[in-house]
């Protein structure tokens, strides 16, 4: 039966409808108060280009009746998440957004990043816009609250870890920690994450005063230091509301079919966080439709829902329904409000300013796409390169030669993909060509090895560090560096990878098999992108070489100390990677390093106390 004919038999009841394509794939999911009337409207009367395209690809349509409109909204949200239909407004890659997990169901809870939310009794906070944002939050929390980092499930009496000795963990592994005290600290972490900062500060102050009254002066001092640290962090947060309200403030940036929603999280009257989340499929949709779709997807997964959400535009007929659904999820009233004046309107303007910046960023990303397309045309590539790798060598008269690899993905630096290499074959001899050949060969040899391990199931692609191959390799230099890189690729069987060189002075691009530079039009975006990649590789190489020299200097100093052999040197350098960190270490921190004892720690401590600071 044709879809238009099938719709005539739909019930006049609330529910959800699905449009399916030729392969049975879900093209669109929607909800309706009356399934018959809503779906029939797609096949009659005037239609937008997008609806016309949807109907043209539709080979079947089905409906699911629900008991109420609110049930339809919930089902619609679940189906959009499951199928990610092409014609719906969807959060871009919403499955990959990270969350912060607090394992409150464990005897001694932990905090860490996760991308899954099983019903395991844990508390989840997010979604966050990136893993880096979660890691930064975890780092801050562990600085304020000494939670454990280990994955142990049984806590028997054993020697505490280094984190315990340096005050970064209470040490439940030792079996000496009061579970109630640890639990109380976890509650303080939850207060911090929920934005209940005034309650947190008051609670810490009360505990400090109680400890002092009970003559527990050491405990009182610990609480005093913790209270000061919390207050210092909170002092850096902007007060954006004179009251102590909790609310989210939303604004929308648009660029063609893409959108970006800014979410300002205000907790206890302070700006706690700013999230930027991407949407796709927004062309020919009003701001109200886009924001309504966003609310249903974002708050479906959100760990916390505030009592008020400020919007830049009203959502129309869906506003009341979405507010009701949010109230059910929060288990308390939620107000969706479009302020026209006053302080709340100023908050929306602040979010809109952030949205304007997001719009500029989206335009940059579009420009980067154009630059990559131009790069493919200029260099004769089959398609625009998504992953670019830049290589450079740095040394000081041949000493401590290092090589680096930097990565651009979709035209932007991806620092998490950067890699460093200590050159082995030409150690002590200044030979940049040989060093370049070695670095490129080692990088692609690792890719080959990891590919085999992944294929046999002995390594997951998530844990691999070199298996992703570039669409283009760029080396800093001229024909000599290009030949060296090409040799490294041939050695490892990757000669098919496109490789080019870019000189510094004349800004000329050289390609294998041609003696003259590749012609590039003046003001070329492609050339600008390659220059950016080359300069970033050079910067990273210089920084890496500087850090290497610093480590070597530290190793040389440790060699002068009696009782500090190779094993202890390695352990000390792992625990204290810089000279300043080692000089600032206390005797207890030094003694807590694996393989160290009190006598060796005293020797290191005395040596650096007598060494003048430069």
From Swiss-Prot:
InterPro entries with a match to the protein in the record: GIY-YIG_endonuc, GIY-YIG_endonuc_sf, GIY-YIG_UvrC_Cho, RuvA_2-like, UVR_dom, UVR_dom_sf, UvrABC_protein_C, UvrC
Listed PANTHER family: UVRABC SYSTEM PROTEIN C, UVRC/OXIDOREDUCTASE
GO BP, one annotated term: nucleotide-excision repair
Residue stretches making up the UVR domain: 198-233
This protein's UniProt keywords: Cytoplasm, DNA damage, DNA excision, DNA repair, Excision nuclease, SOS response
Entry's Gene Ontology cellular component terms: cytoplasm; excinuclease repair complex
Family per similarity comment: Belongs to the UvrC family.
Gene: uvrC
Residues covered by the GIY-YIG domain: 12-89
Keyword Signal applies: no
Subunit structure: Interacts with UvrB in an incision complex.
GO molecular function: DNA binding; excinuclease ABC activity
Function: The UvrABC repair system catalyzes the recognition and processing of DNA lesions. UvrC both incises the 5' and 3' sides of the lesion. The N-terminal half is responsible for the 3' incision and the C-terminal half is responsible for the 5' incision.
Intracellular or extracellular location(s): Cytoplasm
Cross-referenced CDD domains: GIY-YIG_UvrC_Cho
Protein name: UvrABC system protein C
SMART domains: GIYc
Organism classification: Bacteria, Bacillati, Bacillota, Clostridia, Thermoanaerobacterales
SUPFAM superfamilies (alphabetical): C-terminal UvrC-binding domain of UvrB, GIY-YIG endonuclease, RuvA domain 2-like
């Amino acid at each position: 039966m044709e879809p238009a004919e099938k719709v005539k038999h739909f019930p006049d009841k609330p529910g959800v409808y699905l449009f399916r394509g030729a392969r049975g794939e879900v093209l669109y999911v929607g909800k309706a108060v009356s399934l018959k009337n809503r779906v029939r409207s797609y096949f009659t009367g005037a239609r937008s280009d997008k609806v016309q395209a949807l109907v043209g690809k539709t080979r079947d349509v089905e409906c699911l009746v629900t008991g109420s409109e609110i049930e339809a909204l919930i089902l619609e949200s679940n189906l959009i998440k499951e199928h990610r239909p092409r014609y719906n407004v969807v959060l871009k890659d919403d499955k990959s957004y990270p969350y912060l997990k607090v394992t409150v169901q464990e005897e001694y809870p932990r905090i860490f990043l996760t991308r899954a939310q099983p019903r395991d009794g844990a508390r989840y906070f997010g979604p966050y816009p990136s893993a880096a944002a979660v890691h930064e939050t975890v780092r801050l929390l562990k600085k304020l609250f000494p939670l454990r980092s280990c994955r142990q499930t049984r806590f028997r009496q054993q020697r505490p870890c280094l984190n315990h000795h340096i005050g970064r963990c209470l040490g439940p592994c030792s079996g000496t920690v009061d579970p109630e005290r640890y639990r109380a600290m976890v509650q303080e972490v939850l207060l911090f994450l929920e934005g209940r900062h005034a309650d947190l500060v008051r609670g810490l102050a009360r505990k400090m005063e109680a400890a002092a009254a009970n003559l527990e002066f050491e405990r009182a001092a610990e609480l005093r230091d913790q209270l000061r640290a919390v207050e210092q962090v909170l002092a850096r947060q902007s007060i954006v509301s004179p009251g102590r309200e909790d609310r989210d403030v939303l604004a929308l940036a648009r660029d063609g079919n893409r959108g970006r929603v800014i979410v300002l999280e205000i907790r206890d009257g302070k700006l706690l966080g700013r999230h930027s989340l991407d949407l796709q499929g927004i062309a020919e949709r009003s701001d109200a439709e886009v924001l309504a779709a966003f609310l249903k997807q974002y708050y479906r997964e959100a760990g916390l829902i505030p009592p008020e959400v400020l919007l830049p535009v009203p959502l129309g007929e869906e506003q009341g329904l979405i507010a009701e659904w949010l109230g059910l999820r929060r288990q308390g009233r939620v107000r969706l409000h479009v302020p026209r004046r006053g302080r709340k309107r100023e908050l929306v303007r602040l979010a809109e300013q952030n949205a304007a910046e997001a719009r500029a960023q989206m335009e940059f990303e579009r420009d980067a796409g154009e630059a990559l397309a131009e790069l493919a045309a200029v260099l004769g590539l089959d398609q625009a390169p998504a992953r670019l790798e830049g290589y450079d060598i740095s040394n000081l008269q041949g000493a401590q030669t290092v090589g680096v690899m930097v990565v651009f993905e979709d035209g932007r630096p991806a620092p998490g993909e950067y890699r460093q290499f200590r050159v082995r074959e030409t150690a002590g001899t200044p030979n940049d060509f040989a060093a370049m050949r070695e670095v490129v060969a080692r990088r692609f040899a690792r890719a080959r090895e990891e590919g085999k391990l992944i294929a046999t199931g002995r390594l997951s692609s998530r844990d691999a560090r070199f298996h992703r191959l570039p669409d283009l390799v760029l080396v800093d230099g001229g024909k000599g560096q290009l030949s060296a890189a090409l040799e490294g690729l041939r050695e490892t069987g990757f000669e098919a990878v496109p490789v080019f060189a870019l000189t510094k002075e004349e800004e000329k691009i050289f390609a294998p098999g041609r003696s003259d530079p590749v012609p590039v039009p003046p003001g070329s975006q492609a050339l600008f992108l390659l220059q950016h990649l080359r300069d970033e590789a050079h910067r990273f190489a210089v920084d890496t070489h500087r850090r290497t020299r610093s480590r070597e200097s530290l190793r040389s100093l440790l060699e002068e100390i009696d009782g500090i052999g190779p094993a202890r040197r390695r352990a000390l350098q792992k625990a204290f990677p810089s000279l300043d960190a080692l000089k600032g270490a206390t005797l207890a921190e030094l003694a807590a390093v694996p393989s160290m004892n009190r006598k060796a720690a005293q020797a290191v401590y005395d040596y650096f106390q007598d060494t003048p600071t430069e």
